[in-house]
């Protein structure tokens, strides 16, 4: 039974890293029935409880830029939330959330990359670069920040 739980938890983490927070949450809720005493799963449940309403409300925000900004600002709140939890933070779970949240932000910013206004494009390139930096893709981040500075010197 424990091996099955661990396998499903790995699947949940992989889906989470791709940014499908709702599907990952569904898998975790199924696991919770059999793993109430598992501290990693409890920590993940607490993390999902922070994000789930935010993710569900994203479709009500019309502008992709505002969606991206919401995700980035909530990430900062999330880190404060994690510090206050009774569970010891699990770095792997935090990494999976970081990948998922910043991937979602990237998806939203990329919808605006072809903005005709140079200033807007510079800002979008900067935001995309910052997301890639958080995801550990430093070369891509650097390229985006260089593009941002090319479009509007001093932005990035």
Region annotations inferred by a language model:
Residues 14-15, 31, 48, 95, ...:
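Residue-level signature for tetratricopeptide repeat
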Residues 4, 9-19, 33, 97, ...:
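Hydrophobic/aromatic side-chain positions at a characteristic register within alpha-helices
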């Amino acid at each position: 039974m424990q091996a099955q739980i661990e396998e499903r938890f790995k699947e949940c983490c992989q889906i989470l890293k791709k940014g499908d927070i709702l599907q990952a949450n569904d898998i975790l809720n199924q696991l919770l029935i059999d793993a109430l005493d598992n501290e990693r799963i409890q920590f993940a449940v607490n993390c999902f409880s922070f994000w789930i309403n935010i993710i569900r409300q994203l479709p009500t925000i019309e502008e992709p830029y505002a969606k991206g900004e919401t995700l980035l600002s909530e990430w900062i709140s999330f880190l404060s939330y994690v510090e206050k939890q009774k569970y010891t933070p699990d770095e792997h779970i935090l990494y999976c959330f970081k990948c998922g949240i910043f991937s979602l932000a990237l998806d939203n910013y990329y919808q605006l990359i072809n903005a005709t206004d140079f200033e807007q494009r510079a800002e979008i390139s900067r935001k995309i670069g910052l997301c890639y930096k958080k995801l550990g893709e430093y070369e891509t981040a650097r390229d985006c920040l260089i593009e941002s500075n090319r479009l509007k010197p001093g932005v990035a």
